[in-house]
UniProtKB/Swiss-Prot annotation:
PANTHER family (UniProt xref): GLUCOSE-1-PHOSPHATE ADENYLYLTRANSFERASE, GLUCOSE-1-PHOSPHATE ADENYLYLTRANSFERASE-RELATED
PROSITE patterns referenced in this protein's UniProt entry, alphabetically: ADP_GLC_PYROPHOSPH_1 (PS00808), ADP_GLC_PYROPHOSPH_2 (PS00809), ADP_GLC_PYROPHOSPH_3 (PS00810)
Subunit comment: Homotetramer.
Record's protein name: Glucose-1-phosphate adenylyltransferase
Keywords annotated in UniProt: ATP-binding, Carbohydrate metabolism, Glycogen biosynthesis, Glycogen metabolism, Nucleotide-binding, Nucleotidyltransferase, Transferase
GO term, biological process aspect, one: glycogen biosynthetic process
Lineage: Bacteria, Pseudomonadati, Pseudomonadota, Alphaproteobacteria, Hyphomicrobiales
UniProt source species: Rhodopseudomonas palustris (strain HaA2)
Presence of the UniProt keyword Nucleotidyltransferase in the record: yes
Amino acid sequence: MSNGVTAPLARHAMAYVLAGGRGSRLMELTDRRAKPAVYFGGKSRIIDFALSNALNSGIRRIAVATQYKAHSLIRHLQRGWNFFRPERNESFDILPASQRVSDDMWYRGTADAVYQNIDIIESYDPKFIVLLAGDHVYKMDYEKMLQQHVEQGADVTVGCLEVARSEATAFGVMHVDAKDVIQSFLEKPADPPAMPGKPDRALVSMGIYVFDTKFLIEELHRDAANPNSSHDFGKDIIPYIVQHGKAVAHHFDKSCRRSHAEDTSYWRDAGTVDAYWAANIDLTDIVPQLDLYDREWPIWTYGEITPPAKFVHDKDGRRGEAVSSLVSGGCIISGAALRHTLLFTGVRVHSYSQVEGAVILPYADIARSCRLKNVVVDAEVRIPDGLVVGEDPELDARRFRRTDSGICLITQPMIDRLDQ
């Protein structure tokens, strides 16, 4: 079954994005927002990748389930994803946890976040449901996963990829046979089983699932009636289907979208401060691992109206310049020097400041004569004159959130405490 021969299966699919998680390993970066709403890549939010994959794959019915501190996420979705047309059989629904099933029941798990909205799914009558995690960064054609699901007659198809075995404790780990039928599935095991012939690698779930809608609804009703269930796909639904049905693995390499500039399949959890910093800073390389300039697979997002970036002053020691950096619209670099730095919308960096290896979120303001190295600066933070970060590890650890690898997360409450 291939595109151009038959109608794309994506036309008959609905994408359901789970976007309610906090992402606590990002520490204070998610104090005010859910992980899917965290900024990424200069102008996007993390959730834009899953949504753009769905749109670029041809899926035109999308729902997003939200829960933890959802205001900024909902505002972003309303502003940036409001172009769907019902008269063209398109839809975009935002589904906050709202006690729709019981007066004392929020979303109890990932499966429950779908179960509580079964009536909305049924109202659109899709043949397939593509369940997505809204907190990963990657480019993927879900049409190819749908094709494998149909061709193999699966009850559920699970997106998977190889990771280092040492990292697999954070994921669902599976073992498959020669036809990619899943034989076992363990959610976040303390001792992940290795892949055959690859003792240091494990095959893990990406948190992406394809179901026939009818089968999924039956499974959700069965799970909801089980008082011993945690109502979670990875812990309950998928292991049950592995034992009692047919669960098939879909390898990410088969559907990863790569431009001519991308040599390997790119997928990032970006779930820790270190991983988040590294994934963003990688974009400043000459040839980054993730190509955001791929016009054939754009990452859609809310396009805030801003003037172009501006660089001013041209004297020794006070020259507005940026080398190997990404500078978004509305930024003003006033006599400051940037190296391997990513600035989101509306950032201002004032004279005599030196910034290197920095991820600076929207509308932060870096005052004069600062030296910042290997930092993540939260949105709207006001960095005071002369602040130095990245040169004294002990001082940094007392004042900011410093990781073991030396990355400092800076938020406004941390800055406010400097004067106390």
